[in-house]
């Protein structure tokens, strides 16, 4: 398994832990543990990337891995990072970590909120590590569903309207 796949595996383990968690303390414990692991992994990745670059590695994508999923259509799970994606992974991990604590006192449907928040993080992290168009689009679509629900259920103001606008904006033709 490639190191980059950890950024998808940790949120998947968080989902399993949240699914089994009973009580608010267990839910918060799973979220803090997972968010901390993501933040640590992103800091480690940043230092690994900077170490590779300072050692003279000039490859376009570092830590690349390709796994063929469906041969007739040449669909594969292709991941790798460049400088921008490393920075975006680090920023996303910081946002997941701080978002966990910002939602600390959320009471209605706490478990469901954190399940969708974690599902969103799978899509975001997967999007930033993907280097194949199919993989990128798959993770982008994974992120859209939780984003719609997080805005529509836990948002404020005209949340239903805004969630529809946010989801339909990338596909709207003008």
State the predicted function of each range.
Residues 2-3, 18-101, 105-115:
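Transmembrane helix-loop-helix hairpins at membrane boundaries of multipass inner-membrane proteins
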Residues 3-10:
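C-terminal regulatory domains involved in ligand/effector binding and gene-expression control
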Residues 8, 79-80, 93, 129, ...:
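Short conserved micro-motifs on helix faces and helix-strand junctions that flank
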Residues 11-15, 96-97, 119-124:
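Hydrophobic, membrane-inserted alpha-helices
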Residues 14-18, 98, 148, 152:
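Hydrophobic transmembrane alpha-helices
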Residues 16, 87-88, 137, 146:
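Hydrophobic positions within alpha-helical membrane elements
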Residues 24-26, 116-119, 123-168:
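Alpha-helical multi-pass transmembrane bundles of energy-transducing inner-membrane proteins
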Residues 169-174:
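Short "domain-exit" segments at the C-terminal end of structured domains
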């Amino acid at each position: 398994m490639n190191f980059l796949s950890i950024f998808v595996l940790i949120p998947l383990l968080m989902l399993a832990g949240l699914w089994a968690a009973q009580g608010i303390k267990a839910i918060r414990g799973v979220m803090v543990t997972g968010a901390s692991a993501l933040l640590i992994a992103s800091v480690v990745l940043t230092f690994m990337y900077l170490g590779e670059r300072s050692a003279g590695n000039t490859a376009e994508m570092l830590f690349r891995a390709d796994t063929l999923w469906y041969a007739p259509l040449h669909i594969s799970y292709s991941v790798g990072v460049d400088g921008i994606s490393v920075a975006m992974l680090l920023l996303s991990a910081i946002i997941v970590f701080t978002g966990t604590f910002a939602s600390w006192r959320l009471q209605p449907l706490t478990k469901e909120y954190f399940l969708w928040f974690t599902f969103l993080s799978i899509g975001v992290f997967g999007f930033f590590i993907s280097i194949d168009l199919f993989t990128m689009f798959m993770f982008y679509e994974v992120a859209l569903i939780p984003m719609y629900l997080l805005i529509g259920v836990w948002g404020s103001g005209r949340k239903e309207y805004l969630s529809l606008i946010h989801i339909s904006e990338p596909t709207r033709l003008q």
